[in-house]
Amino acid sequence: MKILYPGTFDPLTNGHLDLIERAEKIFGKLVVAVLENTSKTPTFNLERRIIQIKNSLSHLPNIEVISYSGLTVDCANDLKANLILRGLRAMSDFEYELQIAHTNKSLNNDIETIFLSTNTNYSFLSSSLVKEVAKFGGEINHMVPPSVEKDLKDYFK
């Protein structure tokens, strides 16, 4: 069984990190797949996001970090992953993620999506929110790992 946790991670938040750590305890191994989304202009380029994630996950030896573009289901197929992990912060996330899960299932019937609820300490977090707070000089050390905090502060100087 191979588990795929996809996302843009622009940037990685403590919510993402918590989900990865919890999934690693449950499943043992996990592939974090960083999307190069050509329809968005990211704050950090793909290479920088991968470095941020690897730095933040160095204490977890069973986590592999890769990049991909295109459909998540195609990435899962290429890796022979049969489970896609998604985090849920609120009911609105569930509605969106369920639609994506059904789409992925329609493209590959062997792919299942597993949902983990977000730790309540991080249920308010989103990458967009973190960037907004950082942009206006707010404190983000409780929202993101240290290397991401430094990168965001440098970016918004």
From Swiss-Prot:
ATP binds at residues 8-9, 16, 87-89, 97, 122-128. SUPFAM superfamilies: Nucleotidylyl transferase. PANTHER family: PHOSPHOPANTETHEINE ADENYLYLTRANSFERASE. It is found in: Cytoplasm. Its cofactor is Mg(2+). Reversibly transfers an adenylyl group from ATP to 4'-phosphopantetheine, yielding dephospho-CoA (dPCoA) and pyrophosphate. It holds the Pfam family CTP_transf_like. Pathway: Cofactor biosynthesis; coenzyme A biosynthesis; CoA from (R)-pantothenate: step 4/5. It catalyses: (R)-4'-phosphopantetheine + ATP + H(+) = 3'-dephospho-CoA + diphosphate. Homohexamer. It comes from Prochlorococcus marinus (strain MIT 9301). Its main location: cytoplasm. Substrate binds at residues 8, 40, 72, 86. GO terms for biological process: coenzyme A biosynthetic process. This is Phosphopantetheine adenylyltransferase. One of its GO terms (molecular function) is pantetheine-phosphate adenylyltransferase activity. The keyword Cytoplasm applies. Its EC number is 2.7.7.3. The record marks 16 as: Transition state stabilizer.
